[in-house]
Amino acid sequence: MSWLKSMMEKEPPEPENPIGTVVIGNIEPDMHDTAKEAVRRSLKRAGFKTIDVGKSVAPQVFIDKAKETNADIIALSVNTVPAKNNLAKLDEALKAAGLKDKIMLIMGGAAIKKEDATAMGALFGKNKEEGVEIAKKAMAGKKK
C-alpha cells in the first residue's frame, strides 16, 4: 500500500535553489511509471529540479533533454526486461554525445540489479530513499 500512498501525495513545489537537475523517465518500452513518479517527487522534495521525460522513452531523448537542460543526473526506471535490453543503446548514446563521464547515471527498478548498473558505470538505487541519497552524494562530490 505504500505505492498507493506515494501516488496520492501532493506534488511538491519546485525548489527555489535546486541542488542539481535530474532528467528522469522510463526507458522504452517500459510503461510502468508508479515507482518513477515516487522517485521524482522524492528528488523534488530533496531540492532537485526534475525534468520528467515520461514513460517508454527512447535513449536519445534522455541525452537530448540532459544536454538541453544542462542536467547533472539522468535517472532511469527499468521495470521490464525489454527496457533493460535498451540500456546498451543508452550507454552508446551517452558515449556518442560525450556525456559518459560528465553526467551521473542512476537507475533502479524491478528488472535491474546493482551489477547491471555497475557494469554500465551507473549507480543503483533499490528504492526511492536510496536513489535520493545517491543523488545527493553525487552532487556533493560534484561541488568539490
Question: Where are each of the predicted segments found?
Answer:
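Cofactor-cradling patches in redox/metallo enzymes
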Residues: 42-46, 52-122
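N-terminal ligand-binding lobe of clamshell/alpha-beta domains
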Residues: 29-33
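Long amphipathic alpha-helical segments
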Residues: 1-16
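Short acidic-hydrophobic, aromatic-tinged amphipathic segments that line or gate anion-handling sites
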Residues: 123-128
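A charged, well-structured terminal subsegment
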Residues: 134-144
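Phosphate-coordination loops involved in phosphoryl transfer and adenosine-cofactor binding
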Residues: 18-21, 102
